Amino acid sequence: MAAAAARWNHVWVGTDTGILKGVNLQRKQAANFTASGQPRREEAVSALCWGAGGETQILVGCADGTVKHFSTEEGRFQGQRQCPGGEGTFRGLAQVDGTLITCVDSGILRVWTDKDKEASSDPVLELRVGPGVCRMRQDPARPHIVATGGKENALKVWDLQGSEEPLFRAKNVRNDWLDLRVPVWDQDIQFLPESQKLVTCTGYHQVRVYDPASPQRRPVLEATYGEYPLTAVTLTPEGNSVIVGNTHGQLAEIDLRQGRLLGCLKGLAGSVRGLQCHPSKPLLASCGLDRVLRIHRIRNPRGLEHKVYLKSQLNCLLLSGRDNWEDEPQEPQEPNKVPSEDTETDELWASLEAAAKRKLPDWEQTQGALQARRRKKKRPGSTSS
């Protein structure tokens, strides 16, 4: 039953307590999955990506340097492998042609054979991409191409099948009006579809577009949003704009053709850690330090669709690309089954709402009685005058 339920989850979220949470938005349920059976902060999930089997497998990068394999078909972990080397947590995770790609804070990018999940053999490739990495991102159209960037670590594009030198190395923007050097802090990266262009968001609230095919290595477009560091960026389904989130829970859509602000989304209360748009539907999934997963509709009518409190601080997410969200079969519940402690529902909030509705008529009756008493008190005074 757990395996069948896991198959239909719409969003997968990695937490600071080492729990992988699967959320079914149609049923308004969230289920917890751990490899050891207990939450452990030393296994905090810092990166997620789909495995070689598409959405039937999830690769879970943990703070202790392990990458776990989770089957969405069976609803359980199927093994793990150690990926040592470098310092810090995983800043990116990807797979291509049976190999696993990892990158950590200290700038060590490694490619591992993924045939034996329990093995801890030496990597088949190691690249030093520079310290202070904030993000490693794979190009969906060319899986052997990855991009890296971080704090005082400018954007670079690497070919894992080519040389150990980057294909593209971004150049910093010109000095500011005081002739002072502009600091570099790339927080997140995305590849634009059907082109070689990339978009980054920075810790200095800038959105920049780079074109490796152009002669210049500086950004071909730059826009700014707000006053706080931008922490995450995702492409909209059309590919002409991006949505960015910052450390104060603000979300905004930026047009990549003109660099102007298209609109904002409300509802978040903490730093944004993960953003992802559905590939075909106008939906945006977001998570962060306020421990709430939110699904926004990004096209008219723009607004909040779903909101799920998940108890732990949320670090990253994966949004299913399925189109048949509403058409999935409702599987029958087993009779007299005690709900699992790992399943979180909105029953409490539903009961509170129902109680509030029951109290509403009593409140109206009380208001009516008070108004009747006031009219009775006013009548003697009005006749005497």
From Swiss-Prot:
Cellular localization per UniProt: Nucleus, Nucleolus; Nucleus
Cellular component GO terms held in the UniProt record: nucleolus; nucleus; preribosome, large subunit precursor
Segments of this protein annotated with the region Disordered: 323-385
Phosphoserine carried by residues: S214
Listed Pfam families: WD40
Main location: nucleus
Keywords for this protein: Methylation, Nucleus, Phosphoprotein, Repeat, WD repeat
A biological process term (GO) from this entry: blastocyst formation
TM stretches of this protein: none
Ranges occupied by WD repeats: 40-80, 83-122, 128-168, 179-220, 224-266, 267-306
Residues bearing the modification N6-methyllysine: K311
UniProt key word Flavoprotein: no
Superkingdom: Eukaryota
UniProt KW Nucleus keyword: yes
Start and end residues of each stretch annotated as Required for nucleolar and nuclear location: 320-385
Biased composition annotated in UniProt, kind: Basic residues: 372-385
Protein function: Regulatory protein of the MTREX-exosome complex involved in the synthesis of the 60S ribosomal subunit. Participates in an early cleavage of the pre-rRNA processing pathway in cooperation with NVL.
Subunit architecture: Isoform 1 interacts (through WDR repeats) with NVL; the interaction is independent of RNA or pre-60S ribosome particles. Isoform 2 does not interact with NVL. Interacts with MTREX; the interaction dissociation in a late stage of rRNA synthesis is required for appropriate maturation of pre-60S particles and depends on the ATPase activity of NVL.
Listed name of the protein: WD repeat-containing protein 74
Species for this entry: Bos taurus (Bovine)
Lineage of the species this protein comes from: Eukaryota, Metazoa, Chordata, Craniata, Vertebrata
